[in-house]
Amino acid sequence: MAHKKAGGSSRNGRDSAGRRLGVKKFGGELVIGGNIIIRQRGTKVYPGRNVGIGKDHTLFALTDGRVAFHSGKLGRKYVSVDTLAEAAE
C-alpha cells in the first residue's frame, strides 16, 4: 500500500485586500469641503484650485463647488474645484 504521509505546505495561497483607490468624485459632480476626490498612490493627479493633498496623496476639496479635471504643463493632470459662484459667472 502506498501511503503519502507528510506533504509540505504550499508557499503560495495568500493575498491582500484591494486598497479601494481611484476617483471618488468625477468631473462635474458637486462636492462639499472635505470630500475626497481621488485616492491614489503617488501623485498621478495633482491638486489644482481649491484642492488639498493629504500625506498619502489623497486629493480632497477645500471648498464647496464642482469638480473639474484638466491637464497642465509637463503633461500633468490636475483636478480643481470651481466654486458655485465662479461657475455662475
UniProtKB/Swiss-Prot annotation:
Sample GO molecular function, one term: structural constituent of ribosome
Renumbered residue ranges of the record's region Disordered: 1-20
Annotated Gene3D superfamilies: 2.40.50.100
InterPro entries the UniProt entry points to: Ribosomal_bL27, Ribosomal_bL27_CS
Domain of life per record: Bacteria
UniProt keywords, alphabetically: Ribonucleoprotein, Ribosomal protein
GO biological processes: translation
GO cellular component: cytosolic large ribosomal subunit
HAMAP family referenced in this protein's UniProt entry, alphabetically: Ribosomal_bL27
Family that this chain belongs to: Belongs to the bacterial ribosomal protein bL27 family.
NCBIfam families: L27 (TIGR00062)
Stated name of the protein: Large ribosomal subunit protein bL27
Gene for this chain: rpmA
